[in-house]
Amino acid sequence: MSSSQVVRDSAKKLVNLLEKYPKDRIHHLVSFRDVQIARFRRVAGLPNVDDKGKSIKEKKPSLDEIKSIINRTSGPLGLNKEMLTKIQNKMVDEKFTEESINEQIRALSTIMNNKFRNYYDIGDKLYKPAGNPQYYQRLINAVDGKKKESLFTAMRTVLFGK
């Protein structure tokens, strides 16, 4: 098996593991999970798909658009040669090896299995402090949108801290 095929197979394993990774609870413009899936799908030779499973085709410029760009610019896209070499030197060319992808697979699997959370367990003293045992649970409920405080309970929390 050639090294590029081994890298593709490892990237496929990583994509499968990333797809099992839970989506963010709070929707962001860019998600770690989505960016990494798209990145390693290219390495694995898999087509990019959206949330519904439809394949996303990369939009390539048409021949007329390319001709228009060339006709409008005096140099290569209006940039001088020095600037192009600077840009090319700054561009990151990702070279993946089987070992580097396997390291990422191991790191992601330890995160997903809560290995370090279980190893360094801190107990209930920190999660439920004696002064305000429901504090963290209320925060989590507020973030998840499960339980909303009424005006009265919010004022009580502000005034008395509990």
Swiss-Prot record:
Localization in the cell: Mitochondrion
Residues where Phosphothreonine is found: 97
Modified residues (N-acetylserine): 2
Protein's recorded name: Cytochrome B pre-mRNA-processing protein 6
A Pfam cross-reference name: UQCC2_CBP6
Cellular component terms per the entry's GO annotation: Cbp3p-Cbp6 complex; mitochondrial matrix; mitochondrial ribosome; mitochondrion
Keywords: Acetylation, Mitochondrion, mRNA processing, Phosphoprotein
Further comment: Present with 2130 molecules/cell in log phase SD medium.
InterPro entries: Cbp6
Biological process, per Gene Ontology: mitochondrial respiratory chain complex III assembly; mRNA processing; positive regulation of mitochondrial translation; protein stabilization
Entry's Gene Ontology molecular function annotations: ribosome binding
